[in-house]
Amino acid sequence: MSAIYNFCAGPAMLPQAVMQKAQQELVDWNGLGVSVMEISHRSKEFIALTDQAEVTLRKLMSIPANYHVLFMHGGGRAQFSNVVNNFLGDNGQALYLVSGQWSSAAVTEAKKLVSEHNIDSINIVEQINGLYQVKLPDLTAIDKDYRYVHYCSNETVDGIEIFEELDSPWPIVADLSSTIMSHEIDVSKYGLIYAGAQKNIGPSGLSIVIVRDDMLKLPSLPQSSVMDYRVAVEHGSMFNTPPTFAWYLASEVFAWLAAKGGVSAMAEVNQQKAALLYDCIDSNPFYKNGVAPHNRSRMNVTFQLVNDALDSEFLAQAEQAGLVALKGHRIVGGMRASIYNAMPLAGVQALVDFMNNFAVKHS
């Protein structure tokens, strides 16, 4: 069977080696004669798995000792409300930086849970000479006592990524759902990091939350115990039955990434993949991209055909060539190639070859 390269934005492709290992041990995990899906989450075997998963993740991201690592239910949208409920009790206020669809959705969710007067937002994307780019505000010049400032590192729909580090007088809460472990970051600069699993970690239904000790002292709102960060810390992310198979696959992805040389090695490959694809777009008048080069996403490469009447044919022929899930988000249209950690360089090269050939045939 010819190779299939899956460019889906999420749930996204998993490393082939991880999928093959999961297939091999699906019905007999760890010599137990049963699947990892069938054992108690409180068994010594599963506890050993979860302990190792956290150890590996801490090493991969150099997570300081004063941070807790939580494996929680739900995706990024669940954390939109969890952050508010956990940190904005006693009339607390927060600032949201809006760079695209997902950060905007976080604002909308926050305003459902507290008064609109408690949530401030700043649009940080502007269009200059037809290209969208991020302009970070001077947060130190804002005279407000926010509990946190929230931003999304990468807008998967819009193809916009923020590479600059925020200089904030308040704790930073970051949605890293699509960039976690794609390049190195200094975790100590954040109050809380969250990431839905279905892009760079594993299957959907699981979120990783990395939270600093002092954040847990902030006043909270009444909420479900299942989504309370303090309860999750106290119970080792097992207040109730967690999504065990997703946790297992996440642990295997962490091990795979460590074996590949860690986050720094993965960052080099990700840079190569993105450069290869953007070079193809920029060098060919058949395609266009509307994001300024310094804010182009390395994870979600959005592009359009100059002649959009050819979109359907492009997608159909790409699928025939084993290049699937390239259709852009329904809000923005066009094409989107999601090239997370699991996408090999060979997959991006295959896409570039197809794009060049398609352009020649239809020019």
Swiss-Prot record:
Top-level lineage group: Bacteria
Keywords: Amino-acid biosynthesis, Aminotransferase, Cytoplasm, Pyridoxal phosphate, Pyridoxine biosynthesis, Serine biosynthesis, Transferase
Keyword check for Nucleotide-binding: no
N6-(pyridoxal phosphate)lysine modifications at: K199
GO cellular component annotations of the record: cytoplasm
Record-listed E.C. numbers: 2.6.1.52
Pathway(s): Amino-acid biosynthesis; L-serine biosynthesis; L-serine from 3-phospho-D-glycerate: step 2/3; Cofactor biosynthesis; pyridoxine 5'-phosphate biosynthesis; pyridoxine 5'-phosphate from D-erythrose 4-phosphate: step 3/5
Name of the protein in question: Phosphoserine aminotransferase
Gene (UniProt): serC
